[in-house]
């Protein structure tokens, strides 16, 4: 069942705005080519802890605040949002990681429900995203869960053709931007099998994309994700892939209600820092697509999906020792 492996994918952090960004000091050691937004909720939390004299907690949250994370582009004014982020990244000599999560009928009405009102609204929004990228460099993760919700039947059949058309069209439009690298979301190692994804990925435009993304907002280990990605790559012409390692340090959770294994599970840890130095020619990058410390949804005492949750952020950072 898809509910076992979905994750709350929205971000209410203001990701995608880039106001007040700095050109210097934004890249920690090991971040590779990716830009660190100094205005994330994690960064603000560090400031608050320092102000309140909570030095130990501040040091823990710096493990998140000092890393590049995905910028989840808000529905409102996408051109300005994306231009702000990619422009700030360019000034710092880096590139932004953009996450597009606005597909109509998103998340099957679950914790992260929403999305564009219809296909035309989505295309208009996507056009704004593309204009905002311009000729700057950006790594784009395209629509987490959107394809998998077609494969598992969560999305009603009447919306399938339109969604395939929107995904393929998004790949084609974004690839007109010379600096954009586009990865179609392909679920995770605990969801669907590679052979079940071959034709859906083809219909979604993976051949025109730079590759696909695995483990977005999930907890599968890097080893399991790499194995899954390699097998899936063999099904789609050897395409490379990126892995979301943001919270996979301790692997997936297998305690309590299986239907909530994906939602704010306890005892998880930060994973490998973002980098393009993966040691595997098929793995283009480890990314922190999900922003560690943001809730998966209102489960296990957490706030709504995408909201910053200091307690969970501290647990993730502390478990990474």
PLM feature spans:
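Surface-exposed cleft-lining segments at the edges of enzyme active sites
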Residues: 68-74, 112-117, 148-159, 183-186, ...
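Sec-dependent N-terminal signal peptides
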Residues: 1-2
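Active-site cleft segment of glycoside hydrolase catalytic domains centered on the general acid/base Glu
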Residues: 115-135, 144-180
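Alpha-helical scaffolding segments of alpha/beta enzyme cores, especially the outer helices
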Residues: 84, 124-131, 162-173, 196-203, ...
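C-terminal region of N-terminal signal peptides and the immediate post-cleavage residues
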Residues: 6-27
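Structural preference for beta-strand elements that scaffold enzyme active sites
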Residues: 93-97, 137-141, 179-183, 209-213, ...
């Amino acid at each position: 069942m898809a509910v076992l492996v979905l994750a709350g994918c929205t971000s209410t952090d203001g990701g995608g705005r880039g106001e007040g960004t700095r050109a210097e000091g934004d890249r920690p050691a090991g971040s590779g080519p990716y830009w660190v937004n100094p205005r994330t909720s994690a960064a603000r939390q560090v400031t608050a802890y320092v102000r309140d004299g909570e030095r130990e907690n501040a040091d823990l949250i710096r493990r998140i605040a000092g890393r590049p994370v995905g910028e989840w582009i808000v529905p409102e004014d996408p051109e300005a949002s994306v231009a702000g982020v990619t422009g700030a990244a360019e000034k710092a000599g880096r590139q932004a990681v953009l996450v597009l999560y606005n597909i109509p009928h998103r998340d099957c009405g679950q914790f992260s429900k929403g999305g564009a009102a219809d296909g035309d609204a989505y295309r208009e929004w996507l056009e704004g995203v593309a204009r905002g990228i311009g000729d700057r460099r950006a790594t784009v993760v395209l629509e987490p869960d959107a394809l998998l919700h077609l494969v598992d039947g969560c999305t009603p059949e009447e919306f399938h053709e339109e969604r395939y058309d929107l995904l393929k069209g998004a790949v084609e439009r974004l690839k007109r931007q010379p600096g954009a690298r586009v990865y179609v979301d392909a679920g995770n190692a605990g969801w669907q099998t590679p052979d079940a994804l071959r034709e859906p990925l083809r219909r979604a435009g993976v051949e025109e994309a730079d590759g696909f993304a695995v483990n977005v907002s999930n907890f599968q280990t890097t080893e399991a994700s790499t194995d899954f990605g390699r097998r899936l790559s063999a099904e789609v012409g050897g395409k490379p892939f990126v892995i979301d390692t943001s919270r996979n340090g301790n692997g997936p959770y297998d305690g309590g209600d299986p239907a909530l294994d994906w939602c704010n599970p306890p005892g998880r840890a930060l994973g490998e820092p973002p980098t393009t130095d993966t040691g595997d020619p098929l793995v283009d990058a480890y990314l922190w697509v999900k922003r560690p410390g943001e809730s998966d949804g209102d489960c296990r005492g957490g706030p709504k999906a995408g909201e910053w949750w200091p307690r969970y952020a501290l647990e993730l950072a502390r478990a990474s020792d």
